[in-house]
Design a protein with these regions (language model features):
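Outer-membrane beta-barrel channels and translocator barrels
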Residues: 26, 74, 86, 125-129, ...
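Membrane-embedded beta-strand positions in outer-membrane beta-barrel channels/transporters
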Residues: 32, 62-66, 78, 115-119, ...
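Transmembrane beta-strands of outer-membrane beta-barrel pores
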Residues: 37-41, 85-89, 115, 124, ...
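Extracellular/periplasm-exposed beta-strand and loop segments of Gram-negative cell-envelope proteins
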Residues: 41-60, 88-113, 143-183, 209-227
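Transmembrane beta-barrel domains of outer membrane proteins
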Residues: 68-70, 119-123, 191-193, 233-235
Length: 236
């Protein structure tokens, strides 16, 4: 009997520990890191040829790295602030033919930004393996570095010529700047956290602020970020 009681107590303790890992109370806190791949574009409106510009826009492949904290405010509900390094941008590819001359071009824009997201996260336990996580919240970003690479090929009956050009981006509000220095928007995420602490996640970043420098915003000219992010991570 004593052995059965001890065994039963051990099983109850194990079950309680597993449940505690799966749920999160208002007093719990965790720190974690995650990293992964971004697929990003910039959407344009109000420009001459905005529709054609968006049609020729391709996803730019970048990366992300985030340090975050989970702070419980209720059972399976918590706030997740973080500091994130985000590599985003866009690619534009197009071609035109006139008088037997074909001009094709590729423009790749890479932007490095430091972002501060604050997400509200709902955790839905899935038995003893882990929990589904649904998140949403705002972010503010600061563009710190960037570069544009242009590849142009002109093809004539006599042959073709290719030129390459690379320029650093300037961030600010003046007409000679390339992009605004700040960005804000909203994140929407879906992920899964194993009881071991490992996480898998997907996130959609919807840029809401105008990336066109303030002094260049004639008419309704607007450019906004669109970013799909995929990551793996670990929380302690």
């Amino acid at each position: 009997m004593k052995r059965m009681i001890l065994l039963g107590s051990a099983l109850l303790f194990s079950a309680s520990a597993t449940f505690a890992q799966t749920t999160m109370s208002g007093s719990d806190a965790r720190i974690g890191i995650k990293a992964g791949v971004n697929l990003s574009t910039i959407r344009y409106s109000g420009f001459d040829g905005s529709s054609a510009l968006n049609d020729n826009t391709k996803q730019n492949v970048g990366y992300n790295f985030t340090v975050f904290g989970d702070f419980g405010v209720g059972n399976n509900f918590f706030i997740q602030p973080g500091v994130s390094l985000q590599n985003k941008g866009t690619k534009i590819e197009g071609s035109s033919t006139s008088g037997g001359v074909t001009t094709s071009g590729k423009i790749k824009t890479n932007v490095m930004a430091i972002e501060v997201p604050v997400n509200a996260v709902l955790r839905i336990p899935t038995g003893t393996s882990g929990a589904l996580q649904i998140s949403a919240g705002p972010y503010i970003g600061f563009n710190i570095d960037g570069k544009t690479k242009t590849n142009t090929t002109v093809t004539t009956p006599a042959g073709s010529t290719t030129t390459n050009e690379s320029n650093n981006l300037n961030f600010g509000s003046k007409t000679d700047d390339d992009l605004s220095s700040t960005d804000f928007g909203a994140n929407f995420g879906l992920g899964y956290r194993l009881n071991s602490g490992f996480t898998l996640g997907a996130n959609y970043g919807l840029g809401l602020s105008n990336l066109v420098p303030k002094d260049s915003r004639s008419g309704d000219r607007k450019a906004t970020n669109r970013v799909w992010g995929f990551s793996v991570g670990y929380s302690f």
